[in-house]
Amino acid sequence: MSKQTFTTTFAGKPLVVEVGQVAKQANGATVVRYGESTVLTAAVMSKKMATGDFFPLQVNYEEKMYAAGKFPGGFMKREGRPSTDATLTARLIDRPIRPMFAEGFRNEVQVINTVLSYDENASAPMAAMFGSSLALSISDIPFNGPIAGVQVGYIDGEFIINPDKEQMEASLLELTVAGSKEAINMVESGAKELSEDIMLEALLKGHQAIQELIAFQEQIVAVVGKEKAEVELLQVDADLQADIVAKYNAQLQKAVQVEEKKAREAATEAVKEMVKAEYEERYAEDENLATIMRDVAEILEQMEHAEVRRLITEDKIRPDGRKIDEIRPLDAVVDFLPKVHGSGLFTRGQTQALSILTLAPMGETQIIDGLAPEYKKRFLHHYNFPQYSVGETGRYGAAGRREIGHGALGERALEQVLPSLEEFPYAIRLVAEVLESNGSSSQASICAGTLALMAGGVPIKAPVAGIAMGLISDGTNYTVLTDIQGLEDHFGDMDFKVAGTREGITALQMDIKIAGITPQILEEALAQAKKARFEILDVIEATIAEPRPELAPTAPKIDTIKIDVDKIKVVIGKGGETIDKIIAETGVKIDIDDEGNVSIYSSDQAAINRTKEIIAGLVREAKVGEVYHAKVVRIEKFGAFVNLFDKTDALVHISEIAWTRTTNVSDVLEVGEDVDVKVIKIDEKGRVDASMKALIPRPPKPEKKEEKHD
């Protein structure tokens, strides 16, 4: 296929798609140019069904530093593991694409997005999401798209689609929404305490804009789209399924209705093991035993799936016996740990998170050097999910995509209420350790983070709580669930996380397993989430009503002084010599910004005070009219040099020593003598003249004797 180009304008910027020129051996490939951002997307599919009980989809988003005209950092000067932003963008693209493949599809699919040029005012992630959908749609991969995504901002009561950098900085909302022509199927958002009505309207505005992008994709597919390949879907043997359902469905239903998680898991596992043992023995000599046992496992999973959904939709009974809108038992604790700067333990049913606060000087902020201009990140929220939290063994190592994503969600939820840098000049790190998990651990980490911040004396604007909403839908009827547990998440159709304060929403995240959800479901879920959020905030505020007025004794104290910008080099010294000497002497940490704000951190107030004195002395300047207690350091015939302070000397001319005539300076002064002087002049070169006699009352002039006349 020769190169073909398709052009439109979207959100005020040119959107150009090129097909047929590059990556022609992939099943589908596109080059998307949005503004001056350029993204190459290639989609490929394995020829055979993969083993395993899941769909092996891999979406990558690769940031090439050359795209922004930068050299990679580090010794190797080559791109390494994906940045946090790249990982989050890959997840952002994966989530709306994944539901658009058929049930039982098991071929491996890879979608690789490479950023070739970067324009900070034209969203490369949105170009990559568009390119991913289009590459799959024009390929022979059986993808039931297209989908598209947009960013939505909110400034002065107006919604803005794909805002540029300046607009995003002024926006009260940072929303990414994706979906198909019919419905929304992915949401990711941070917001500055916006109402449910505004958030819902933003979602609908975003979905309207998505229609333009989908229509554009459909035009391209009509011209260059390939015929979809016939692939084998994972389907179980119908006779085997009927046999197992008839014999064991009642037993499995009974096991599913056990309320306590561990007991329920044990009961369902016992039934499954009994069934597997029977059929493994029955077909032991069959050459297709592996396929049969795979089908048995899949049938049992489908039976459990069907019973959980039936209980909720028909009987309105949840696996643990709760009502549809009921939250599990809550508990909130502060000061769980000594020595740390703040800690909070939050428990919701069998989900538990411990959050630990650490405060540090601003010099500890994380420097982010990606495709965007380098910047410093003041607030970090890290989420850890050890396998013991679900009673299992498993991999331990660096944070995976899921942990990075959950940490980022908590970060967005909490950063909206943090004090400004001027109010609270600290770098802030929260670490969420998930100790138990039965669903919604990311929201528990938000609640625990609120407790830790307030216990640590961080003056947040308001406490934040999070809740996860679920959905069971048969296409006609649906049920929205409050505070979903693991089983409801696994067998349900939606995981909709909502975090916020009493004033409004600070973060949203939605993933679904069906093609999309309607505005009615979104509205109902947001309303139920608000009610639940307020219930959780009641528990948090009963434990700690407001941030403590003081930091923990172990937290670094801070004081700030302002110096002239031209004095920064004086405090730092040649090669940092002066500031290093101060730090070595006092044991403090010092940060100096470009405006001359000096922040001094230490747990010892006396050390802070001493540091302030040293710095004040370094930057101090003599002023005309001020009086100084000085020390004579040198004597010359024409006067004496005195030290006013630190490295600032002044000349007391011989004529300024006394009102009477001074013949020899050494007759009046000696080196090391303390004298009081007044600065009377500073010339253009900074040389200081001082006077001793200016501080002495001038003696009266002698009266003239009257002449006698004869």
Curated annotation (Swiss-Prot):
UniProt-listed GO biological process terms: mRNA catabolic process; RNA processing
Biased composition range(s): Basic and acidic residues: 700-710
Residues that coordinate or bind Mg(2+): D489, D495
UniProt domain KH: residue ranges: 556-615
Biological role stated in the UniProt entry: Involved in mRNA degradation. Catalyzes the phosphorolysis of single-stranded polyribonucleotides processively in the 3'- to 5'-direction.
Family statement drawn from the similarity comment of this UniProt entry: Belongs to the polyribonucleotide nucleotidyltransferase family.
UniProt-recorded name of the protein: Polyribonucleotide nucleotidyltransferase
Organism name: Streptococcus pyogenes serotype M2 (strain MGAS10270)
